[in-house]
A protein has these predicted regions:
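Short glycine-rich anion-binding loops that position phosphate/pyrophosphate groups of nucleotides
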Residues: 12, 79-82, 110-113
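S-adenosyl-L-methionine/SAH cofactor-binding core of RNA-modifying enzymes
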Residues: 40-104
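Loop/turn-to-beta-strand initiation segments
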Residues: 3, 102-107
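General small-molecule cofactor/ligand-binding pocket signal
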Residues: 7, 35-37
Length: 160
């Protein structure tokens, strides 16, 4: 069984995000060993300067690197990442397993994204969409796509 870690900056606060995440975590338990790690989000002022943004990226990046599991595949969610279909995500996850990478870690940055240093650690950069979404919603979207990917691999009727 694959081990999947979702390493994310920021804590879910809104009930609808918490409920959605809990539902997908429950569904995913049959397909993988899932661990969600929430890291503190660096507090930024309302209109941060480029230096303040850089400081936040560095602080959040250090926290990510500290908690990053050793070995396995690393996937960074970022706007410049590769767009892919649900079927392709399913294939990529299976390919990681064939390569002996039974641990897959997905990285979700905070409101200012991921530092370039963190992105360089990734085996694959994935974009959920060319549109911009709140990072909390990106977590829900990722969890749904992980569930869908495992259902595709299992040949169930969930994915149409």
């Amino acid at each position: 069984m694959q081990r999947v870690t979702v390493l994310c900056v920021g804590k879910l606060k809104e009930k609808f995000y918490i409920d959605a995440a809990a539902e997908y975590v429950k569904r995913l338990q049959r397909s993988c060993k899932l661990d969600i790690v929430e890291l503190p989000e660096y507090r930024l002022p309302e209109d941060p300067s480029p230096a303040e943004i850089q400081k936040a990226l560095q602080a959040e990046g250090a926290a990510i690197r500290e908690r990053l599991p050793k070995g396995g595949a690393v996937v960074a969610l970022c706007i410049e990442g590769k767009l892919c279909s649900s079927e392709e995500l399913s294939r990529r996850m299976a390919d990681f397993g064939v390569q002996g990478k039974t641990q897959i870690t997905f990285l979700i940055g905070g409101s200012v994204g991921l530092s370039e240093d963190v992105k360089k650690l990734a085996d694959w950069r994935l974009s959920m969409s060319p549109m911009t979404f709140p990072h909390h919603m990106a977590r829900i979207m990722l969890l749904e796509q992980l569930y869908r990917a495992y259902q595709i691999a299992a040949g169930t009727k969930y994915h149409k």
